[in-house]
Curated annotation (Swiss-Prot):
Keyword Cell division attributed: no
Keywords: Cytoplasm, Phosphoprotein
Coiled-coil residues: none
Protein's recorded name: UPF0744 protein C106.03
Broad class of where this protein is predominantly found: cytoplasm
Compartment(s): Cytoplasm
Source organism of the structure: Schizosaccharomyces pombe (strain 972 / ATCC 24843)
Length: 357
C-alpha cells in the first residue's frame, strides 16, 4: 500500500465526516423540534400535588390532630397511676424528707404516704413532733433537728444496712417546703415579729437542708424546692414577705446546684395558699381550699421529680404560671412598675393577677 495514498484518503474521509456533522447541526438549529417532557404520574407526585392544592386544610387538620394528641397526653399524664417501687415483700423502702411541717407539707406528706413512700418530717421541737404524730400514719415520722443523737442515727441508718439490696432503705430526695403565707398585706402593716418569724423559719429550713447534704450526696438523692413562681417573677406590691421568701428559695436552690452538683429541681407554683387548709377536714370547712386540679398537678410533679429519669431543673404548675413567669423575663422594669401603679390606683391587682383558688 502506498503510504501517501493512504494518508490522502484518511484526510478526505475526515473532511467529509466533519462536513456532515456541520450540516446536521445547522439543520437542527434552523428547524428546532419541540421537546416532549414525559411526566411520571406517580403516587408521590399526586400526593405532593394534593398537599399543595389543599395546604390550608391540611395545615388546620395537622394542628387539630396535634392539639388533640397533646390534650389526650395531658389527660393521661394527669390521671395515670404513680406509685413508688417496693421490696419483694411489699414493704416500703423509698424515703423522702420534708424540710418543715406546715399545711402544705401535710398535704404533700399524706400524698407521698399514699403513693408508697416513707416520709420523714424535720421539726423544731416536741410540740411539732406531736402534731405530726396526730396524723396517725405509721409511715409519716418526725425527726427533731435539735436532738443531735437522733439526727446522727438517722444519717447512719442508710449506711449501716445489712441484707439484700432490694430490702434496703433508699433516700430519694428532700423537699424544701416554703413557709409563710402569701396573703395581701401592705408593707406598713408588717410588724417586726412577722419579719423575724418569716426569716427565722426560712433560715431553719435552709439549715436543715445543709445538714442533709452529705447524706444526699451519698444516696444520690434529689433536692426539690417549692416556690411561688409568680411572686418571685413580678415581686408585686403588698406581697413583700412572700415575694422575698420565694426569691430567696430560688436563689438558694441555684446556689445548691452549682456548689454541690446535686440534682436540684425548682417547682414554681401559681401562688397556692395551703396555710389555712386542713387536709383531714371537709373542703367546706377550710377557709382557703385550693383547687383540687391544681393540687393534684403539684403532687404529680413532685412525684415525677423524685423518680423521673431526666427531670427538668425548673417546672411550672399550670400553663398560667408558665406563661406569666415567661412573660416577666421580657417585660422591662418600667412597664411592670407602670402596670402595678395602674392596679394600685384602681385596686384591681389583688384580685386579677395574684389570687388563685
Amino acid at each position: 500500500m502506498n503510504p501517501e495514498r493512504w494518508a490522502a484518503d484518511l484526510v478526505s474521509n475526515v473532511k467529509d465526516y466533519g462536513k456532515r456533522i456541520i450540516d446536521y447541526a445547522h439543520e437542527k438549529t434552523s428547524n428546532p423540534q419541540p421537546v416532549t417532557v414525559h411526566t411520571t404520574n406517580s403516587a408521590k407526585g399526586r400526593l405532593g400535588e394534593f398537599l399543595y392544592q389543599n395546604r390550608v386544610s391540611v395545615g388546620l387538620g395537622s394542628a387539630a390532630l396535634f392539639l388533640a394528641g397533646l390534650s389526650y397526653y395531658k389527660r393521661y399524664d394527669y390521671v395515670r397511676k404513680r406509685r413508688a417501687p417496693r421490696a419483694p415483700n411489699h414493704q416500703k423502702t423509698q424515703v423522702v424528707v420534708l424540710s418543715a411541717w406546715n399545711p402544705l407539707a401535710s398535704v404533700i406528706a399524706h400524698d407521698l404516704d399514699r403513693r408508697g413512700f416513707i416520709v420523714v418530717v424535720l421539726v423544731r421541737d416536741a410540740s411539732e413532733a406531736a402534731t405530726v404524730s396526730l396524723q396517725q400514719r405509721p409511715y409519716i415520722q418526725s425527726l427533731i433537728v435539735t436532738h443531735n443523737e437522733a439526727v446522727e442515727r438517722f444519717l447512719l441508718s442508710f449506711s449501716n444496712q445489712s441484707g439484700p439490696k432490694e430490702y434496703a432503705l433508699r433516700l430519694r430526695g428532700l423537699i424544701l417546703v416554703p413557709t409563710g403565707d402569701s396573703l395581701y398585706t401592705p408593707i406598713e402593716n408588717i410588724g417586726k415579729d412577722a419579719w423575724i418569724s418569716a426569716f427565722q423559719q426560712l433560715s431553719e429550713s435552709f439549715s436543715n437542708v445543709s445538714r442533709m447534704i452529705p447524706l444526699l450526696k451519698s444516696q444520690k438523692a434529689r433536692i426539690i424546692g417549692l416556690s411561688h413562681g409568680i411572686l418571685s417573677a413580678y415581686e408585686p406590691p403588698n406581697y413583700a414577705v412572700p415575694s422575698i421568701l420565694s426569691s430567696s428559695i430560688e436563689t438558694f436552690l441555684r446556689t445548691l446546684k452549682r456548689e454541690t452538683g446535686l440534682q436540684v429541681i425548682c417547682i414554681k407554683l401559681g401562688n397556692l395558699s395551703f396555710l389555712n387548709y386542713d387536709h383531714s377536714s371537709s373542703p367546706g370547712k377550710s377557709n382557703y381550699p385550693p383547687s383540687l386540679c391544681t393540687e393534684r398537678k403539684v403532687l404529680n410533679k413532685i412525684f415525677d421529680s423524685l423518680l423521673g429519669c431526666w427531670p427538668s431543673p425548673t417546672r411550672h404548675v399550670g400553663c398560667r404560671t408558665f406563661f406569666m413567669v415567661t412573660v416577666s423575663r421580657f417585660l422591662p422594669t418600667c412597664v411592670i412598675d407602670g402596670i402595678f401603679s395602674l392596679f394600685g390606683k384602681f385596686h384591681f391587682f389583688s384580685c386579677s393577677l395574684i389570687k388563685r383558688s
